[in-house]
Amino acid sequence: MFNMNINSPVRFVKETNRAKSPTRQSPYAAGYDLYSAYYYTIPPGERQLIKTDISMSMPKFCYGRIAPRSGLSLKGIDIGGGVIDEDYRGNIGVILINNGKCTFNVNTGDRIAQLIYQRIYYPELKEVQSLDSTDRGDQGFGSTGLR
């Protein structure tokens, strides 16, 4: 089922002349940096959809995960949403959330997030009356402790 040629290039389109090609900053970087095609201002506590003006065709059996950049995370900037489905072909947008205390400016050409390609499995779902029990059971949200 996972017959995927990892050497096949991923096709993308620059929708406008403002778009920058996604790039990796090192040979072993997990993600490709995505760039803002426009200038935006994000006040503290607010969020903004940032357009890249890039559209692309995801590899078969993969989806694109939009992940934060560590340098922006240090400034209180996070990502909302973050999934690009295999069959999506539109302008890739990134929701930036300003959790900081200062207004955050996004300049045209700024690196705003990273795109990571991940394999996906499309299971068939089956409703049942109960699930197999485990030692953990329904314990979640901190139930395993800090240490």
Swiss-Prot record:
It comes from the Viruses. GO terms for biological process: dUMP biosynthetic process; dUTP catabolic process. It is an enzyme of class 3 (hydrolase). This is Deoxyuridine 5'-triphosphate nucleotidohydrolase. Its EC number is 3.6.1.23. Its cofactor is Mg(2+). The keyword Metal-binding applies. Belongs to the dUTPase family. The gene is OPG046. It comes from Camelpox virus (strain CMS).
